[in-house]
Amino acid sequence: MTNEQTDTDVGIIGGGPAGASMAAYLAKAGVKCVVFESEIFPRPHVGESLVPSSTRVFRDLDFLRVMEDSKFPRKYGAGWTSAAEAPVYDHDWDGLGELDAHVDGPNLRFEERDQPGVNQIYTYHVDRGKFDLLLLQHANQLGAEVYEGVRVSRVDVNGGPPAVKYNIAGRETGTTCKIVVDASGRRTLLGNQLKIRVRDKVFDQFAIHTWFENYDRTTWNRNESQKDFIFIHFLPISNSWIWQIPITDRITSIGVVTQRKNFAKTRESREEFFWESVGSRPDLLEKLRAADQIRPFREEGDYSYAMQQIVGDRWLMVGDAGRFVDPIFSTGVSIALNSSRFAHRDILGALETGNFTRAAYHTYESTIRRGTKNWYDFIQVYYRLNVLFTYFVTDKRYRLDVLKLLQGDVYDADEPEVLAKMRSMVSVVEESPAHPWHKLLNDLTHDAFRPTF
Ligand SMILES: Cc1cc2nc3c(=O)[nH]c(=O)nc-3n(C[C@H](O)[C@H](O)[C@H](O)COP(=O)(O)OP(=O)(O)OC[C@H]3O[C@@H](n4cnc5c(N)ncnc54)[C@H](O)[C@@H]3O)c2cc1C
C-alpha cells in the first residue's frame, strides 16, 4: 500500500446507499475512510422499492441479516395495471409466436429466474429513513468514520491528494485523502463543481408522492402470491404512471410521475394535480380517498442526467452522483449499491499500486456505464411503446430475458438480445403508419438522446 501522507485514505461525500456501501466495502477491506453526510439520519428519501441485484451487495457486506431482522416487506415481484386494457393480445408479430397460455398478463415473479449469487426469491421495499440509517451504521460498525451534519462545500481535485472542504462553526476546514468518492446523490457535488453534468434531453419527468395508511392495496392482486408486489398503475395521460410501494403492513407509498409539460406550476395546484391524476383512474381514486394521508406531499423534479466523466485522477462518482436514469423500474438503489461494489475494487487496486490516475478506475467506469446504458435503452423503449413491454413479458421466449433486466442483472459484457429486438420493433412501428401499434407510440423519441461522451 502507498505510504503517501494524508488524513485518511478515502473521503466519501454522502451517506446514502452509494456512500454507505462504499464505506462498508472499504472498511471491511481494512481501508481508512471517512463519510461526510450533510443530514442527520434518519431522514426521508424517495426510492423505496429495491431490485434483487441489491442482494449481492447485502451478502458481500454481511448486511442481509440486518435486512431480515428489520422486517422490511418482502418484494416477490411486480405488476402493472392500466385503465383500459391496451389491445396487446390481438396483434400478431413476425418473429413473436403464440403467447404462452400459462402466463397471466403483465406481472412477474422473481422466482421465475435463478440469479447467480442471489439465493433468495425476493428483495425488499424499504422505508428509506430506516434503511439508509441502518446501512450507514453498519459501515460505521465495520470501521468507517462517519460524520453526520457536515455539508461538503467543495473538493480540491487538482491531481494531488484531494482536499474535502466543509464549514465547522463558521470556519472552513478540510480533510485530505488519497482518493475522493462523490456519493452526494442528485446534488451531484463534483459534477456541478467540474461543470460536467449533462441534462437528459429526452426524460424531463416530475414526481409528487406521499404515504397513505389503510389503503387497500390488495385490490390489484390477482392471487395471494402478489401480496406486497410493487404495482405500477398507468394513467391515460402521456408518459404518466403511479407507483404503489408497500412500506409496512398498513402504510403504502404512492407517487405520481409525469412529464414536465403536464406538471402544475404552484404548490397548491400540485396537490390538486396529484388528485386529478389519480382521478384519471377512478378505481384508484376510490381506494385512495378512503385511506389516510400520513405525510406531506414531496416533489422530485426533472431528475434525469448523465456526466461527461464519472472518474478522474483521484476521484470517482458512485450512485446518483454519477448518473440518474428514470426510476420506472426501481433501479436507483441497486445502481448505487452495485456502483460501489464495482468501484471499490478499483480503489483497492489504486491504493495497492499507488496509481491514482483516471486509468486506474477504468473497469468500474466501463462496467457501470454498460449497466446504466442497458437500463436506459430498456426504459426508453418502454416509454416509447408500452405495449411492446407487455408483449415481450407475455411471450415465453423473452419473458426471462426481460426478467433478468428487472432483477438488475444488467452488467454482462454483451448487450441483452431482447433489447436489440425491442429496438428494431420500435423502428418498424415508427416507420409504418398503418401498423396497428403506430397510434400507441408515445412522444418520447426512440433514440433522441445520444451521449456525446
Ligand atoms: C421520483 C423518484 C422515484 C424513485 N424510485 C425509486 C425506487 O422505487 N427504487 C429505487 O431503487 N430507486 C428509486 N429512485 C432513485 C433513488 O432515490 C436513488 O437512486 C438512490 O437514493 C441513490 O442513492 P445515492 O446514495 O446515490 O444518493 P442519495 O440516496 O440521494 O444519498 C446522497 C446523500 O448525500 C448527501 N449529500 C448531498 N450533498 C452533500 C454534501 N455536499 N455534503 C455531504 N453530504 C451530502 C445527502 O444528504 C444524501 O444523504 C427514485 C428516484 C426518484 C427521483
Feature locations, PLM:
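Beta1/beta-strand and adjacent pyrophosphate-binding region of the FAD-binding site
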Residues: 3-16
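N-terminal Rossmann-fold NAD(P) dinucleotide-binding loop
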Residues: 19-20
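Glycine-rich FAD pyrophosphate-binding loop
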Residues: 27-46
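N-terminal FAD cofactor-binding segment of flavoenzymes
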Residues: 45-88
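Feature captures the FAD/FMN-dependent oxidoreductase FAD-binding
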Residues: 81-179, 183, 189
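Predominantly flavin-linked oxidoreductase catalytic cores and closely associated redox partners
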Residues: 138-284
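FAD/FMN-dependent oxidoreductases across multiple families
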Residues: 262-346, 350-363, 370
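C-terminal helical "tail/cap" subdomain of flavin- and related membrane-associated enzymes
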Residues: 345-453
